[in-house]
């Protein structure tokens, strides 16, 4: 990776180190549903405090549209959970600008950790509009002024240019201060980058999810890079329509059928679609179901891939040396239509001798549900960011970091 990393930082002891982490965790009534993203940030935080740095953490949490949102989306419970994981006191400051924050930072001792309030409170707490989300340079400069060096460890927001990532990095570099990648960001770029740019072959991509429109760029980019691209999930049926198959009441993007036709022609035998599907007479876990090959009957909608498709996909995957999986094979949140997604997750968990990378909420949830997460090479923490990276796009949060 041609970007400077936290390991390149010199003389951290006594320095104020700003760290953009991704603590955007599911939270309800102050209870954290999944602390994975907090855990993922620990190596970078630990490195800074072990070397005597003062770790000042910034993160967003959810989208803030009202004062009501602010009560639900405070980072206070996240700071408490971080303290438990680090087994040390973590200071929380209920603001992200002003005297209270500045005093708390100036009072920090070496090896201490401080979490400031949700950066997106800046999207409503002022007369200037969405200062954080719109990357207000003055806000980036202000936050940069609070530290001696900046570490971006938030891959989940790397595809967005916000004041708390691009803004701070830009201001730091303008003042000849370091702006580097944390261990998590470095790991994401390493695994996703190597998978796409220098994969051990055969390289198989598995793409699921509801919409072709969300994944068009990724499909096109990966068709040029991968040996096979497996397509499942709701977007399958736009491809079915493009092939002239009947799709019943299945999800379809009418305005993307022509594009799907072009992709099928361009891909040749690289593109692998499900040969059979589990269909239902209603979008419900209790609906009447059947397994059908090819055409989907009128009055039915396809909600998962069928057993022959699972066997086909596993046959393609069994010899793979690199696999990237993003998106479910069916309506994963309904048990009766989760089998395809779970089967792929289980197969990848038991695939030996291959680099296996999983991204996206449902795919990640599937491997966790199966307990095979630790058997995979890498679980990406970025949904949209990993998709844009797989599409070959430059991510602003990474571009803003200092080059080696």
From Swiss-Prot:
<keyword id="KW-0067">ATP-binding</keyword>
<dbReference type="GO" id="GO:0005829">
    <property type="term" value="C:cytosol"/>
</dbReference>
<keyword id="KW-0324">Glycolysis</keyword>
<keyword id="KW-0808">Transferase</keyword>
<keyword id="KW-0418">Kinase</keyword>
<dbReference type="Pfam" id="PF00162">
    <property type="entry name" value="PGK"/>
</dbReference>
<feature type="binding site">
    <location>
        <position position="37"/>
    </location>
    <ligand>
        <name>substrate</name>
    </ligand>
</feature>
<protein>
    <recommendedName>
        <fullName>Phosphoglycerate kinase</fullName>
        <ecNumber>2.7.2.3</ecNumber>
    </recommendedName>
</protein>
<comment type="subunit">
    <text>Monomer.</text>
</comment>
<dbReference type="InterPro" id="IPR015911">
    <property type="entry name" value="Phosphoglycerate_kinase_CS"/>
</dbReference>
<keyword id="KW-0963">Cytoplasm</keyword>
<feature type="binding site">
    <location>
        <begin position="22"/>
        <end position="24"/>
    </location>
    <ligand>
        <name>substrate</name>
    </ligand>
</feature>
<dbReference type="InterPro" id="IPR001576">
    <property type="entry name" value="Phosphoglycerate_kinase"/>
</dbReference>
<keyword id="KW-0547">Nucleotide-binding</keyword>
<dbReference type="GO" id="GO:0043531">
    <property type="term" value="F:ADP binding"/>
</dbReference>
<feature type="binding site">
    <location>
        <begin position="60"/>
        <end position="63"/>
    </location>
    <ligand>
        <name>substrate</name>
    </ligand>
</feature>
<dbReference type="InterPro" id="IPR036043">
    <property type="entry name" value="Phosphoglycerate_kinase_sf"/>
</dbReference>
<dbReference type="GO" id="GO:0006094">
    <property type="term" value="P:gluconeogenesis"/>
</dbReference>
<comment type="pathway">
    <text>Carbohydrate degradation; glycolysis; pyruvate from D-glyceraldehyde 3-phosphate: step 2/5.</text>
</comment>
<dbReference type="InterPro" id="IPR015824">
    <property type="entry name" value="Phosphoglycerate_kinase_N"/>
</dbReference>
<dbReference type="GO" id="GO:0006096">
    <property type="term" value="P:glycolytic process"/>
</dbReference>
<feature type="binding site">
    <location>
        <position position="333"/>
    </location>
    <ligand>
        <name>ATP</name>
    </ligand>
</feature>
<dbReference type="GO" id="GO:0005524">
    <property type="term" value="F:ATP binding"/>
</dbReference>
<feature type="binding site">
    <location>
        <begin position="360"/>
        <end position="363"/>
    </location>
    <ligand>
        <name>ATP</name>
    </ligand>
</feature>
<feature type="binding site">
    <location>
        <position position="215"/>
    </location>
    <ligand>
        <name>ATP</name>
    </ligand>
</feature>
<dbReference type="GO" id="GO:0004618">
    <property type="term" value="F:phosphoglycerate kinase activity"/>
</dbReference>
<feature type="binding site">
    <location>
        <position position="160"/>
    </location>
    <ligand>
        <name>substrate</name>
    </ligand>
</feature>
<comment type="similarity">
    <text>Belongs to the phosphoglycerate kinase family.</text>
</comment>
<feature type="binding site">
    <location>
        <position position="120"/>
    </location>
    <ligand>
        <name>substrate</name>
    </ligand>
</feature>
